[in-house]
Amino acid sequence: MDFTAKIKELERELSETSDYKTLQKKTISLRSELNTLSHSLTSYEKEHFSNDIENVLKSINAKLSESKGKKRLFSFKQKNSSSAVHKNVERTELANAPAYTTTLKKHYVLEKGDSAFENLEFCTVTSTTDYSGNSALSGSLCFRNITKCVINLQRIFFQTGSIFITDCTDSIIFLRSPSDKDFQIRLRDLKNCKILIEKLSPSIDCKQVVIIENCHKCIFNASTRDHLIIQDFSNPFQSEETEDNSAFAFEDFDICNKDTMQLFRAYL
């Protein structure tokens, strides 16, 4: 398949159409095709096409947001880490926030939908456990510039899509992925992070692919070794059977019953 031509066609349609929902579905479908054919592509090609598709999808999501009159794309609850009182807070577009703004000591509860978090320090991000609605068919999560935080998502509110974490340091990342679906996890520029990526159901046999790039001293919990495939795009000589000790390793560490505040106190 000529992914370059397909991506250019999506970019052309984005500049001409107002039917962003249909274009979003086509883009997600192309991402699925890329994942299916990834074994026949070089690491560079996979990374290049994946980045281009994600950029198109990000532009489509922005257009969808604008077309809805800047309605909120998701809702979460926010509280100071010193307070037990949750307050409903409408999302502000992180892309418009000044790059120097850093949020300190906040607790975010993800409830549904596409989500983006940026410039957090000594914060926690968890997913609600009492949500009774249906998960969306597709979506994306993005975390950027995260320092000394706990990301503990035991539920993700879409069935197919991607999680992208970049520029993350000294943090704890727990994810529960629906591995029976087309689901992409990408980690870029992570340093000294402890990571636990579990499957939605222990009965799911397929492995979850995790793409990493420019990562350093990251620890994946040893219990996840059998169901993860780590693809290091910074190391073209790495195979699925080996790990680059300077980038990542599988080791045991205390998961603190997956309790967010216990993790925060234990490691941060």
Curated annotation (Swiss-Prot):
Subcellular location: Cytoplasm, Cytoskeleton
PROSITE patterns assigned: C_CAP_COFACTOR_C
Lineage: superkingdom: Eukaryota
Positions of disulphide bridges: none
Keyword Chaperone: yes
Chief localization: cytoplasm
Alphabetized GO MF terms: GTPase activator activity; molecular adaptor activity; small molecule binding
Keywords, in A-Z order: Chaperone, Cytoplasm, Cytoskeleton, Microtubule
GO biological process, one term: tubulin complex assembly
InterPro entries assigned: C-CAP_CF_C-like, CAP/MinC_C, TBCC
The keyword Chaperone belongs to this UniProt entry's keyword annotation: yes
Residues covered by the C-CAP/cofactor C-like domain: 98-255
GO cellular component terms listed in the entry, alphabetical order: cytoplasm; microtubule
Further remark: Present with 1630 molecules/cell.
Function: Tubulin-folding protein; involved in the early step of the tubulin folding pathway.
Protein name: Tubulin-specific chaperone C
Organism for this UniProt entry: Saccharomyces cerevisiae (strain ATCC 204508 / S288c) (Baker's yeast)
Gene: CIN2
